[in-house]
Amino acid sequence: MRNASQLVAFVNAVAMCFAFTPAEGLPLPACFDHLSTSDTDRKWGWMWGWKDELPEEKRLYYGPVLARKPTFVSMRFLPVLYATFGRAGEADDHLEDVRSGRLSDIARRIIELVTQKGEVQTRRMRAELGITSREGRTQYGKALDEVQRLMYVARVKAVGEGREEYNYTYDLFVRRYPEIVRAAEPIASADARARALARAVKLAGGLTEKQAAKLFDWGEEPLRRAVERLAAARGVVRLERGREAIVVLRRYADAA
């Protein structure tokens, strides 16, 4: 790949991939491995612009989705990943994740601020939340990743010129991508998780259950049900290898 259109075509073909470098121990595609240059600076130069430009145009989705790393998702596959959360579409959907500990209090405040204010810049958001200390900024950065990973909040666009002014605007996922939310409505969360896992296994050829857990962070029981669902449909085979279970495509089972 050497231009934005080729990147879009690549992501459409794989459905989801790491936006930059691979994640350690996770054999899924990473864009840096498919760029038509070996120059690291050029790779970053190309990708840094594309990861702002293409999501703003809604040609790709970008966020910390897989293994909490920067991820590209095709617009066709995005409803499947959104449906894995099984949201009711209510304004207080996030409170269950707060109670369960999946969202921090700062994450809750970010969601509620964006709900009230609409699309808002990072700098203004921090100011509105009263975050000024170094520790507070670190916690805020982690919380912003949390709300994007769980698809409560989505990045909209880059704004500002130069290093000092450069930042992003964010809005609620449901306001930024209403068409994705509508497309996700008919997909049951269990079906969505099975489809997402099937795609990951197809891309990798096989994954240990530990790798799948790191990739999606669904929790032990939803992951177990997704594996069972795929195995029942004869899409994958679950193999015991010592203390670890491996989920592989059926056609690779004999070689695993």
Positions of the model-derived regions?
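Long, low-complexity intrinsically disordered regions
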Residues: M1-A256
